[in-house]
Design a protein with these regions (language model features):
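Short, surface-exposed "cap/lid" segments of acyl-processing enzymes
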Residues: 31-59, 69-70
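Catalytic histidine-centered segment of alpha/beta-hydrolase-like enzymes
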Residues: 77, 246-256
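Alpha/beta-hydrolase active-site loop
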Residues: 78-97
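Gly/Ala-rich beta-loop-alpha elbow adjacent to hydrolase catalytic centers
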Residues: 106-111, 115
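Active-site nucleophile loop of the alpha/beta-hydrolase fold
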Residues: 129-140
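Active-site nucleophile elbow and catalytic-triad environment of alpha/beta-hydrolase enzymes
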Residues: 184-203
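Short beta-strand/loop motif that positions the catalytic acidic residue
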Residues: 205-207, 213-215
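Conserved alpha/beta-hydrolase "acid-adjacent" motif
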Residues: 220-226, 251
Length: 269
């Protein structure tokens, strides 16, 4: 009888232990709530048609914030790059304050550039999602009519006249546009060795985080520097470099399915 009671007690203990293990496993497997801050490209807007397929894929899984950045078609560098970084930081903070556990920053073209700069300057995101990264000030400086404006902005800043308005030729995928903005703002974006330099940002991440990098075979950056910039990033086992058959504009759409699966894998959703 005593042996029988001992056996029952042992079985009961095993059942309780097993139940505890299952409960622990369930807790560990609980999906992370997730939020994604997405930024449009140069001269674009928050409701970018290029980002729309990505938003549609992500929204059933994650909350998405779409920001209007200082390089939008209406703002045209009305604030320096540091202000853009503060804007991203505010969006990330809002997610955190609402209880979101996993927060990524990303975007298309200039928005991708900003996500890299953000991790170098602030570094509090859990992942980075650069798609068709763009805005390459070190290359723009080689173009004479663009360089004139950049030099004028730099000279004004060095003279303590950062509020001076400067006329400059801006470039976007071969298109030119005349812009006028403060010297301080223009220099912050177009300094060849400044925040807009993606290779410098990549090697300056404040911490290693997983990066989902998407580039199209028809994107000008694909043969000229995309992989080299990616290789500057701190190594992370979950990072992915995805090449898609697409141009600069439709790379996010071509990568949207892979991005969605990648985010789900990171968050357990």
């Amino acid at each position: 009888m005593r042996n029988g009671l001992a056996t029952l007690a042992t079985l009961a203990t095993l059942v309780l232990v097993a139940a505890g293990c299952l409960a622990g496993a369930s807790a560990l497997a609980e999906p992370l709530s997730c939020g994604v801050v997405l930024m449009h490209g140069k001269w674009g807007m928050p409701q970018s048609p290029y980002l729309k397929p990505v938003v549609q894929k992500l929204e059933p899984t994650c909350q998405v914030k779409l920001l209007e950045m200082p390089w939008s078609r209406w703002r045209l560098y009305d604030k320096p790059y540091a202000d853009a970084q503060a804007q991203i930081r505010q969006a990330v903070s809002e997610f955190r304050q609402s209880g979101v556990q996993w927060v990524a920053v990303g975007g298309q073209s200039f928005g991708a550039n900003a996500s890299l700069a953000y991790m170098a300057q602030v570094g509090d995101a859990d992942a980075v999602l650069p798609m068709a990264p763009g805005h390459v000030p070190e290359n723009f400086y080689l173009i004479s009519d663009v360089r004139r404006g950049i030099d004028a902005a730099q000279q004004a800043v060095q003279a303590g006249q950062g509020d001076t308005l400067v006329d400059m030729t801006d470039m976007n995928q071969g298109q030119r546009r005349q812009v006028k903005a403060s010297a301080a703002a223009l220099w912050s974006y177009f300094d060849p060795q400044g925040l807009g330099n993606m290779a410098l940002s990549a090697r300056s991440f404040r911490k290693p985080v997983p990066v989902f990098w998407a580039i199209g075979t028809l994107d000008p950056l694909y043969p000229s520097g995309s992989a080299a910039i990616y290789q500057q990033l701190p190594a992370h086992a979950d990072s992915q470099y995805l090449v898609v058959q697409a141009n600069h504009a439709n790379t996010p759409e071509a990568a949207s399915e892979a991005l969605w699966l990648w985010v789900k894998a990171r968050t357990g959703r």
